[in-house]
Curated annotation (Swiss-Prot):
Site feature location: Important for catalytic activity: 172
Subcellular location: Cytoplasm
Native organism taxonomy: Bacteria, Pseudomonadati, Pseudomonadota, Gammaproteobacteria, Aeromonadales
Gene3D superfamilies associated with the record: Glycoside hydrolase, family 3, N-terminal domain
Chain's role: Plays a role in peptidoglycan recycling by cleaving the terminal beta-1,4-linked N-acetylglucosamine (GlcNAc) from peptide-linked peptidoglycan fragments, giving rise to free GlcNAc, anhydro-N-acetylmuramic acid and anhydro-N-acetylmuramic acid-linked peptides.
EC number: 3.2.1.52
Protein name: Beta-hexosaminidase
Length: 334
């Protein structure tokens, strides 16, 4: 499997995209809202992508719930994780049900992965906000662990993001290069706690680092940093799963240079799969510029659950879970 995950422009593939998908460096496709019209169209698009690639291909989407849910009409509405605590003593069970429902519905369309859950603490970052479970690390651990259990029950792997924590910076890494000036001691006592606890518990199959520079510790964003990915994540915390880069076309990645330089820097730091989204020229530059890229280990994230929507929606679990999640969402989401 190649180490580059890229996007496609619309609800159908064009000729250039079919050719790009056959490139040996391409190992995945990330889908967005613009790729979705309805469920039957989505299933047809996914089938066409897999046929065009003619090789194992990881298909992913950001489908966390709340404001980050790419497919809406026809899919269950997943609430933002930041309001699950309102279910009080039922919050943990509700988190499991949300994780299962989200994953099961995507798998029923042959989509392998949702980049979830968010493990960032809610500490004033607008770009994170209610995407976070809580400002309290222990509550994040409890609810994220339950959400992941639901994903795993459905047959989907979990991706924790954004390591080592994006919640304490206000800048949006899509638009600029955020800087976090805190010490190691403060970061380890707060933002790193969910990662530190969930990794040895075997909950996290993949991790996505932040395009944030932690100035007291390294001059590179975490996704380009051997300190963060090799010394801390692999070494200190013993993480053996897949590391995704965040989108290499984001402004927060520009410090590493042009697109091929960004891709090589991420690979050198220890990323297994690179994301290049919303910039066809940038993705093509990476394909042309990467010299003999290593094969990705991300094939382990492919789903073995060949789902079927009609079969899924006829089960009592889907009916009961969908009903409970929708009642909660309608009560607490405007």
């Amino acid at each position: 499997m190649g180490p580059l995950m890229l996007d496609v422009q619309g609800c159908e593939l064009d000729a250039e995209e079919r050719e790009i998908l056959r490139h040996p460096t391409v190992g995945g496709v990330i889908l967005f809202g613009r790729n979705y019209h309805d469920r039957s169209q989505l299933s047809a698009l996914v089938k066409t992508i897999r046929q065009a690639a003619n090789k194992p291909l990881l298909i992913a989407v950001d489908h966390e719930g709340g404001r980050v849910q790419r497919f809406r009409n026809g899919f269950s509405r997943i609430p933002p994780m930041g309001i699950l605590h309102k279910a009080r003593n039922q919050a943990t069970d509700l988190a499991t049900e949300c994780g299962w429902l989200m994953a099961a519905e995507l798998l029923a369309h042959d989509i392998d992965l949702s980049f979830a859950p968010v493990l960032d603490l809610e500490r004033g970052s607008n770009v994170i906000g209610d995407r976070s479970f809580s400002s309290d690390p222990e509550q994040v651990i409890q609810l994220a662990s339950a959400f992941i259990d639901g994903m795993h029950q459905a047959g989907m792997k979990a991706t924790g993001k954004h390591f080592p924590g994006h919640g304490s910076v206000r800048a949006d890494s899509h638009l600029e290069s955020p800087r976090d000036n805190r010490s190691w001691e403060e970061i380890e006592a707060t933002d790193l706690v969910p990662f530190r606890e969930l990794i040895p518990a075997g909950k996290l199959d993949a991790i996505m680092p932040a395009h944030v520079i932690y100035t007291e510790l390294d001059d590179q964003p975490a996704g380009f940093s051997r300190f963060w990915l090799q010394e801390v994540l692999r070494g200190k915390y013993g993480f053996n799963g897949i590391i995704f880069s965040d989108d290499l076309t984001m402004e927060g990645a520009a410090v590493a240079g042009g697109y091929p330089e960004r891709a090589q820097a991420a690979l050198n730091a220890g990323c297994d799969m690179l994301l290049a989204c919303n910039n066809r020229a940038g993705a093509v530059a990476i394909l042309d510029g990467l010299q003999n890229p290593p094969a990705s280990r991300a094939e382990s994230l492919l789903s073995t659950n060949n789902g079927d929507w009609s079969r899924l929606t006829s089960t009592s679990r889907w009916k009961n879970t969908q009903n409970r999640v929708q009642i909660f969402t309608e009560e607490f989401v405007n």
